[in-house]
């Protein structure tokens, strides 16, 4: 599964702690992140992370583009609800795309833990069907 990890500045430490705690689960998946968040996760866990631009420089939009192409399976986005963000429209668009494409989205550690446990149990395997793939990973003949 492809997992996006995003954290606002005030939530980066929390994201690093989360990624460290769940590194054994995350190691089985393809990780994507915005710039600094991805670097901090890589340094703390040693896990490979595909890094996009920083959020205010288009990173949220790059992840949003993957969602719109149905290439992202799970988004964990630790938002700071108490600080105004200059790229708030991008954040809203990202969250809207998760709703449009039925991509599970966690915006706090409580929900993130529920989703990561579900991922660990295989409860999110339905995402491969939504992506038009069979169990073996090849594309379905009915895919657009």
Swiss-Prot record:
Positions bound to substrate: 8, 12, 34-37, 54-55, 87
Occurrences of domain MGS-like (ranges): 1-144
Gene3D superfamilies in alphabetical order: Methylglyoxal synthase-like domain
Active-site positions on this chain: 60
Catalytic activity: dihydroxyacetone phosphate = methylglyoxal + phosphate
Assigned GO CC terms: cytosol
Family to which the UniProt record says this protein belongs: Belongs to the methylglyoxal synthase family.
Protein name: Methylglyoxal synthase
Provenance organism: Geobacillus kaustophilus (strain HTA426)
Lineage: Bacteria, Bacillati, Bacillota, Bacilli, Bacillales
Gene it is expressed from: mgsA
């Amino acid at each position: 599964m492809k997992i996006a990890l995003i954290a606002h500045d005030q939530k980066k430490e929390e994201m690093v702690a989360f990624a460290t705690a769940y590194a054994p689960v995350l190691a089985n998946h393809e990780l994507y992140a915005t710039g600094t968040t991805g670097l901090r996760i890589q340094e703390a866990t040693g896990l490979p992370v595909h890094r996009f631009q920083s959020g205010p420089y288009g990173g949220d939009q790059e992840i949003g583009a993957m969602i719109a192409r149905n290439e992202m399976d799970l988004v964990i986005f630790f938002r700071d609800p108490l600080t105004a963000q200059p790229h708030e429209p991008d954040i809203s668009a990202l969250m809207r795309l998760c709703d449009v494409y039925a991509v599970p989205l966690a915006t706090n550690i409580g929900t993130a833990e529920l989703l990561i446990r579900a991922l660990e149990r295989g409860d999110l395997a339905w995402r491969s069907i939504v992506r038009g793939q069979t169990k073996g990973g090849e594309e379905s003949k009915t895919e657009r």
